[in-house]
């Protein structure tokens, strides 16, 4: 079997970023493969999240903080200057896009086709052609045309999703995976440095998955046997990365 990576955010900001990243990956998958009406679920979830909360201010603060840190790293010896310059340029461009006045995705509210679908998609089995004949018509279009439509819709969220992808890449890069052992299925750790993300890589052949809890200075990992759905009493070898 293969290694699986599990991630646990230790603050609400990273929790929100991971949710948005997850939806972004689903959007990309739907853009490259024809999943019929299922492509609308991540799109409408993203619309819902962006309407509940305007993430721009938080993301802009994070961009500024990371640009400041990258500038300091740039002055050090033995650093990957090309990689640092890439992130500086990418974050600077993302900041310019995110500073536009309109909220990401707000224009999609004016799309009558999407609005009609969104009202129905929360209802079980409501994608029948007698409920949504306009969806039935759209799905009959050639895949290339639907792909262009989908690209146009999701592009409204690029100013938000692009910097979040970069910020999460930088967060994950703050720690490497190290060997660890969960004795009797349990592992506990602490850190003098404030943490934002705990990452666990474990071989699926162990037949278990981790449940992770904690806050910025302390965390705990319990491994659960999948077949029995109860806490494992075995020693589990895994890889651990604690990201600042």
Curated annotation (Swiss-Prot):
Location within or outside the cell: Cytoplasm
Keywords: Cell cycle, Cell division, Cytoplasm, Septation
SUPFAM superfamilies the record matches: YacF-like (SSF160950)
InterPro entries in UniProt: ZapD, ZapD_C, ZapD_sf
GO cellular component, one term: cytoplasm
Signal peptide residue numbers: none
Entry keyword annotation includes Thylakoid: no
Alphabetical list of Pfam families matching this protein: ZapD
GO BP terms: division septum assembly; FtsZ-dependent cytokinesis
Residues spanning the membrane: none
Subunit structure: Interacts with FtsZ.
Sequence similarity: Belongs to the ZapD family.
HAMAP family in alphabetical order: ZapD (MF_01092)
Function of the molecule: Cell division factor that enhances FtsZ-ring assembly. Directly interacts with FtsZ and promotes bundling of FtsZ protofilaments, with a reduction in FtsZ GTPase activity.
Name of this chain's protein: Cell division protein ZapD
Organism: Shewanella sp. (strain MR-4)
Taxon lineage: Bacteria, Pseudomonadati, Pseudomonadota, Gammaproteobacteria, Alteromonadales
